Swiss-Prot record:
This is Histidine N-alpha-methyltransferase. It comes from Mycolicibacterium smegmatis (strain ATCC 700084 / mc(2)155) (Mycobacterium smegmatis). Pathway: Amino-acid biosynthesis; ergothioneine biosynthesis. GO terms for biological process: ergothioneine biosynthesis from histidine via gamma-glutamyl-hercynylcysteine sulfoxide; methylation. It catalyses: L-histidine + 3 S-adenosyl-L-methionine = hercynine + 3 S-adenosyl-L-homocysteine + 3 H(+). InterPro entries: EgtD, EgtD_Actinobacteria, EgtD_Methyltrsf_superfamily, MeTrfase_dom, MeTrfase_EgtD-like, SAM-dependent_MTases_sf. Catalyzes the SAM-dependent triple methylation of the alpha-amino group of histidine to form hercynine, a step in the biosynthesis pathway of ergothioneine. Among all the proteinogenic amino acids, only L-histidine is a substrate. S-adenosyl-L-methionine binds at G86, K92, D113, D141, F142. Changing M252V: Dramatic change in substrate specificity since the tryptophan-specific activity is increased more than 2000-fold and the histidine-specific activity is reduced 3000-fold. Pfam families: Methyltransf_33. It is an enzyme of class 2 (transferase). PANTHER family: ERGOTHIONEINE BIOSYNTHESIS PROTEIN 1. Consists of two distinct domains: a typical methyltransferase domain and a unique substrate binding domain.
Length: 321
């Protein structure tokens, strides 16, 4: 096993991005905070709990598809290199790596993430499980550094978990177009998309009975409090999940239970919340199969294969340029 890590992020890039995002979001109308700030250590643990909840079907459904279709996916892709946009520590990653190993194709794993620590631990774990594998980790930002992913071998780039749904249509189109530009002849993209379904099931997946998603949502306030010396009262905000039928997306909001005055000392910023005012913290767009094909085509990609679960809850696309 060989392990390399290329880091394209400045040491203070995360701190600067947080400052920029919080100032922009808290001075906008409606107020908002980007979902990437959910994921400190506490938030990551809460999200791991969410993926195991009975109401939260996406993770287990995507895993079910991969469990039954990984060999087929790898046969179609013919890849010797797995590029994962994300941490590379999940069960789903291993299903694909196992299929590549079983097909005697596996040579290389390239995890891409914003967190160098996550990349090191993921790389070490994968290296221990797959002797002889070459690991070329890339620490970077999706918006800036996709072009830094090494052009080596025949690559299968995977973007799972319907993370693509956290992008609204314009940024999503830009992301897919940029990603398409990085693909060379012989490369493939495996894209996970959560599909439009019964509204009740969708809302429950983001508003579970145990309140884990509510704690996850409020945790973004704890991150701002800790990192930017703010004084949000977490208990003064309630979690709200709703279906936006026009945009076909779930939205997560934090609603002020009473009027609030919040100071963010590190930004020298003070903001007021009216009682009942809602702040947007996440969108999770859902897809129709024909729209997935169209969005890929718009980015210059051709869907060659489509896999879904028996209930049609979740879809995996294999696409090429």
């Amino acid at each position: 096993m060989t392990l390399s890590l290329a880091n394209y992020l400045a040491a203070d890039s995360a701190a600067e991005a947080l400052r920029r995002d919080v100032r922009a979001g808290l001075t906008a109308a409606p107020k908002s905070l980007p979902p990437k700030w959910f994921y400190d250590a506490v938030g990551s643990d809460l999200f791991d709990q969410i993926t195991r909840l009975p109401e939260y079907y996406p993770t287990r459904t995507e895993a079910q598809i991969l469990r039954t279709r990984s060999a087929e996916i790898i046969a179609a892709a013919g890849a010797d290199t797995l590029v994962e946009l994300g941490s590379g520590t999940s069960e789903k990653t291993r299903m694909l790596l196992d299929a590549m190993r079983d097909a005697e194709l596996l040579r290389r794993f390239i995890p891409f993430d914003v967190d160098a620590g996550v990349l090191r631990s993921a790389g070490a774990a994968i290296g221990a499980e797959y002797p002889g594998i070459e690991i070329d980790a890339v620490c970077g930002d999706f918006e800036e550094h996709l072009g830094k992913i090494p052009h080596v071998g025949r690559r299968l780039v995977v973007f799972l978990g319907s993370t693509i749904g956290n992008l609204t249509p314009a940024p999503r189109a830009e992301f897919l177009s940029t990603l398409a530009d990085t693909l060379q002849p012989g490369d493939s993209l495996l894209l996970g998309t959560d599909l439009v379904k019964d509204t009740g099931r969708l809302v429950r997946a983001y508003d579970d009975a145990a309140g884990v998603t509510a704690a996850f949502n409020r945790n973004v306030l704890a991150v701002v409090n800790r990192e930017l010396s703010a004084d949000f009262d977490l208990d003064a905000f309630e979690h709200v999940a709703k279906w936006n039928s026009d945009e076909e997306r779930i939205e997560m909001w934090l609603r002020a239970r009473t009027a609030q005055h919040v100071r963010v000392a590190a930004l020298d910023l003070e903001v007021d919340f009216a009682a009942g005012e809602e702040m947007l913290t996440e969108v999770s767009c859902k897809f129709r199969p024909e729209n997935v094909v169209a969005e890929l085509a718009e980015a210059g990609l051709r869907q060659t294969h489509w896999w879904t679960d028996p209930a049609g809850d979740f879809g995996l696309s294999l696409a090429v340029r």
